[in-house]
Design a protein with these regions (language model features):
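Intrinsically disordered, low-complexity, mixed-charge
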Residues: 1-80
Length: 80
């Protein structure tokens, strides 16, 4: 299987609550590579690459892992 890439933009209470730490831990647990960063507007952007099943499992794992974050909206963009 070939790797695919996606970018997510999370809004809500996602800064100052360990969101990037838990997102990175979840991605590593699933065997994904990529990056995560805070944005000036209070949102967080995450880009990851890997197998489709792992990418599909990433957001639910982040939501279960971090009890302090409150994700209000997620925008997903497939990348080439």
């Amino acid at each position: 299987m070939s790797a695919i890439r996606r970018r997510w933009r999370f809004t809500g209470t996602v800064q100052g609550v360990g969101f990037r730490y838990y997102a990175r831990a979840a991605a590593l647990h699933l065997g994904l590579t990529g990056w995560v960063a805070n944005n000036w507007d209070g949102s967080v952007t995450l880009e990851a690459q890997g197998e489709r099943a792992a990418l599909d499992a990433l957001v639910p794992l982040i939501e279960r892992s971090n009890r302090w974050a409150r994700i209000e909206n997620v925008e997903v963009t497939p990348l080439p």
